[in-house]
Amino acid sequence: MDMFSWQLGLPSTLACLVFGYLLGSIPFGLILTRMAGLGDVRKIGSGNIGATNVLRTGNRKLAAATLLFDALKGTAAAAIASYWGVEAGIAAGFAAFLGHLFPVWLSFRGGKGVATYIGVLLGLMPVMVLLFAAIWLAMAKITRYSSLSALVATAAVPIALYAAGNGKVAGLFAVMTAIAWIKHRANIQRLLSGTESRIGEKG
């Protein structure tokens, strides 16, 4: 599959982008913590709306629910749009990822995108989720760094997709990986300085 060719018409592409963005911009971490009476998750820990920061409330079930819903919005966007072809799924999935990172409802301050990244991957190439999970779990067991595990796993995905002959999807995830790394720049700095929190530690 040619990574650079694009056959989907402009109106259809725009429709997929809008659909994906609106779905991806739903801030489940914020909604769930408020519904649970835990206040504004943006005012605790890292200030992030993702599952890792929700976990800092001490409510593991709520963090798991946030992870699930943040992933599923990416899956739904990509899978539903894919009914009209892989390019539609790519456009909607990418927009859902951006919607999570930059939700218009929260002044464009969202999460770091790993859960939604996984969700989009599930919607487009389900088998690759197994690769992501295997790498993440292996790295987490060895290093106990959640952020490093995610960074390594996201780096491996586009390489594996390209090697499998899925050029367009590989291109999508190469871009998403680059964005995810940028969103994790503070984590990268802490990893380099040895101050990043390990799994099971508060911080």
From Swiss-Prot:
Top-rank taxon: Bacteria
Transmembrane segments: 13-33, 62-82, 88-108, 118-138, 159-179
GO CC term (a single one): plasma membrane
GO molecular-function terms, A-Z: acyl-phosphate glycerol-3-phosphate acyltransferase activity
SMART domains: G3P_acyltransf
GO BP of this protein: phospholipid biosynthetic process
Coiled coil (UniProt feature): none
Main location class: membrane
Record field: catalytic activity: an acyl phosphate + sn-glycerol 3-phosphate = a 1-acyl-sn-glycero-3-phosphate + phosphate
Keywords of this entry: Cell inner membrane, Cell membrane, Lipid biosynthesis, Lipid metabolism, Membrane, Phospholipid biosynthesis, Phospholipid metabolism, Transferase, Transmembrane, Transmembrane helix
A Pfam match: G3P_acyltransf
Topology in the lipid bilayer: Multi-pass membrane protein
Compartment(s) of residence: Cell inner membrane
EC number assigned by the record: 2.3.1.275
Metabolic or biological pathway: Lipid metabolism; phospholipid metabolism
SUBUNIT field: Probably interacts with PlsX.
Stated role: Catalyzes the transfer of an acyl group from acyl-phosphate (acyl-PO(4)) to glycerol-3-phosphate (G3P) to form lysophosphatidic acid (LPA). This enzyme utilizes acyl-phosphate as fatty acyl donor, but not acyl-CoA or acyl-ACP.
Family note: Belongs to the PlsY family.
Protein name from the UniProt record: Glycerol-3-phosphate acyltransferase
Organism the protein comes from: Rhizobium meliloti (strain 1021) (Ensifer meliloti)
Lineage, top ranks: Bacteria, Pseudomonadati, Pseudomonadota, Alphaproteobacteria, Hyphomicrobiales
